[in-house]
Amino acid sequence: MEQELTFRIILEKPPAGVDFGLQQGRGSNYEVVQKQRSKTGDLHFEFTARVKNGKDGPTLLGPFVQGPPNERFVYLGIGTFAGQTDTPWSRRLKIPLRGITWDVIKQASAQVLETRVRGTGKDGSPTCGTIKPFAGWKVKPL
């Protein structure tokens, strides 16, 4: 049985003047959607993924989902990876899709799974790479 889940990423206070976007597709065959230029506040990205019964629990599928079944994630493109030409930044932010159990899926059926990610690194540049530590996904109202 497949079910569709809605996800929301809140990128908290990224550096101003940088483009961010959600990567749809894989490898070199992708496009950036929901492109946003940071100003002073948070950026919000939403996407859906299908979930089906996998060998070791839920398996997420869809055009935004990347990686092997047990290590799924989504990418946010930063700077040139989001299509911005007037920037020194050329990065991606890897947001894990882990910790999503059948119990969480049941709770989230008519709601959204939300995570909050720090948008600025310790050096003042856009956060990039794999999110560590990752706070996980929380069930929130739509």
Question: PLM features: residue spans?
Answer:
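Generic structural detector for well-ordered beta-strands
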Residues: 10, 50, 94-96
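Short proline/glycine-enriched turn/loop motifs at strand-loop junctions of beta-rich domains
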Residues: 12-17
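A short, amphipathic beta-strand motif
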Residues: 5-11
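Tryptophan-paired
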Residues: 27-81
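Beta-strand acidic-aromatic groove motif in beta-rich domains, primarily in extracellular
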Residues: 19-22, 59-61
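Extracellular beta-sheet/turn segments enriched in Thr/Pro/Gly and aliphatic residues
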Residues: 81-142
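Short loop/turn and low-complexity linker motifs enriched in small/turn-promoting residues
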Residues: 8, 21-32, 139-141
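Extracellular ectodomain segments of secreted/surface proteins
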Residues: 1-3
